[in-house]
């Protein structure tokens, strides 16, 4: 199906482009979302008449998105989840969780704006892209931790798993020293 794009669509084209897409994509996504019109003579004439108005509206929404991106860029949000000692989450952090964390931080972010390649399944700091407009995106950091204390440690740049491994190594060293002392005391007694 041939459609006229009413706004920039990622991996498809710019506003005003006439592109060929699959019928289902056009009927189920582009047309209902108001992102495109069927490419027929009447719609092409209608688009040409409204083109200046659509470009002005697009420019206005882009400026609003750029202002929001400037505020949102580099922000850090904490998400508390239960996890194993190895740092694997017992669930995952999804775009919905990231959007809720940003909303709790005072920003208006919808889950559809959060771009995750895959759900987050480990403790730590994770960079997440927020697409505020087809041409504007911001990067936020999601700090996934078991508690607020662990979140503060991770924010300082330390890894919870690394600290736990160091504590285990120190404990094993102390146990080895105790056994050495006990062994030395036993050989002194003989």
Swiss-Prot record:
SUPFAM superfamilies noted in UniProt: L9 N-domain-like (SSF55658), Ribosomal protein L9 C-domain (SSF55653)
One Gene Ontology cellular component annotation held by this UniProt entry: ribosome
Function noted in UniProt: Binds to the 23S rRNA.
NCBIfam families in the record: L9
Disulfide bonds: none
One Pfam family, short name: Ribosomal_L9_N
Record GO terms (molecular function): rRNA binding; structural constituent of ribosome
Residues making up the signal peptide according to the UniProt record: none
Similarity comment: family membership: Belongs to the bacterial ribosomal protein bL9 family.
Protein name (Swiss-Prot/TrEMBL): Large ribosomal subunit protein bL9
GO biological process terms held by the UniProt record: translation
Keywords: Ribonucleoprotein, Ribosomal protein, RNA-binding, rRNA-binding
């Amino acid at each position: 199906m041939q459609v006229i794009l009413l706004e920039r669509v990622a991996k498809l084209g710019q506003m005003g482009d006439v592109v060929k897409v699959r019928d289902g994509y056009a009927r189920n996504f582009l047309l209902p979302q108001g992102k495109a019109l069927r490419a027929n003579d009447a719609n092409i004439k209608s688009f040409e008449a409204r083109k200046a108005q659509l470009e002005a509206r697009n420019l206005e929404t882009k400026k609003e998105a750029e202002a929001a991106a400037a505020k949102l860029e580099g922000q850090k949000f904490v998400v508390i989840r239960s996890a194993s000692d190895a740092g694997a989450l017992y669930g995952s952090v999804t775009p919905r969780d990231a959007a809720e964390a940003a909303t709790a931080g005072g920003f208006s972010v919808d889950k559809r704006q959060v771009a995750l390649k895959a759900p987050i399944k480990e403790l730590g700091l994770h960079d997440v892209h927020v697409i505020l407009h087809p041409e504007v995106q911001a990067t936020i950091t999601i700090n996934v931790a078991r508690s607020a204390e662990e979140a503060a440690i991770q924010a300082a740049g330390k890894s919870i798993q690394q600290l736990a491994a160091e504590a285990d190594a120190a404990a094993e060293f102390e146990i080895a020293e105790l056994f050495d002392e006990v062994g030395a005391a036993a050989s002194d007694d003989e």
